[in-house]
Amino acid sequence: MASPQSPSSSPRHYSLFLAIFSLAVGGFCIGTTEFVAMGLIQEIAHNLKITVPEAGHFISAYALGVVIGAPPIIAILGAKVPRKTLLLCLMLFYGIANACTALAHTPETVLVSRFIAGLPHGAYFGVGALVAAELAGPSRRASAVAQMMMGLTVATVIGVPLATWLGQHFGWRAGFEFSATIAFFTLIAVACFVPNIPVQATASIKTELAGLKNINMWLTLAVGAIGFGGMFSVYSYVSPILTEYTKVNIQIVPIALALWGIGMVIGGLAAGWLADKNLNKTIVGVLISSAIAFVVASFLMSNIYSAIGSLFLIGLTVMGLGGALQTRLMDVAGDAQTLAASLNHSAFNLANALGAFLGGWVLSHQMGWIAPIWVGFVLSLGGLIILLIAFAVEKATQKA
């Protein structure tokens, strides 16, 4: 009896473009939801009658949901449930959680709904990346995964500014209603254009969980958890920094977020090209350049034009860390590729939680609106130190 063929090896009865585009729409939805709370943090705080640092806990709650949710979903469901079915369930859950946020009217219910919304985040990207790679085949898998992930980056350019604008003009809940609507369209797109992929016979919980013993994988994840946190220490409070310190009109915030997102798109693509040449040097370069960008920004935030330029520079330098670390994880994760893919997003959202928490902490201790930028500088250096330790451990492991 013939063995089942994968979609990439059997006659194609689907559009690769539409399949990956459908997955990217889900990434756009998740990216919009993840960042919109940062753009609307002042509106949320005012409406719920809490302080801006207290509203920052909603950002941390979402990020912690990602950290906690991805590993068990991937390890348990990822080994048993068909990937298309899993993607549909994850996005349905995501849309409902965002609708619950829009309906929440107390700080406690918003906090819980944001945590719940974060649970399927990492699993969606982990499974979506594997689906994109399998559909494209070995010769195009890297570009397919990059295209799927582009939905997240494009969200920072289009989705977040649009959701922020909606929240400012129609109430902050409109931003989350927008995200829930995108989740609904993602469900339709994935159901219609992503083909069914059978569960691999070799997939097992044991194989994935074995990766938890890999020290090189954990150190690489730690680089992202610390080094990427600097972006969120600033991004989480960019709205009050611009309005309270730079003294710009709040209507400028969506424009600043869009330019930050453009920097992220350019930086991510440039870092990907450089990583093909030398992966480890690219990661080092990203961490050093981002540290420099934070220092530059700390001195240039008093003027509207230099402030927006500084935010563009931070986005340009920091975003390259994501794809480069994902590629490094492929090199060090061994047989636990699926778990590593999901844990990468857990690490980045741990960075989200850490950055938002530390940024809020320095603000709550009256250290000034520029203090979150210096937090970013410290976290970038911390990520660099961990990376150098990872290189040393990897070298010692290879000699052993």
PLM-predicted stretches and their roles:
Residues K281-L325:
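C-terminal transmembrane helical hairpin of 12-TM major facilitator-type secondary transporters
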Residues T85-A99, K281-V296, F377:
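Structural signature of the two symmetry-related core transmembrane helices
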Residues V332-G368, G376:
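A late C-terminal transmembrane helix in Major Facilitator Superfamily
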Residues G69-P82, G267-L279, L363-S364:
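Helix-to-loop junctions at the C-terminal end of transmembrane segments
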Residues K49, V81, L103-T109, L300-S302:
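Helix-breaking motifs and short loop linkers at transmembrane-helix boundaries and internal kinks
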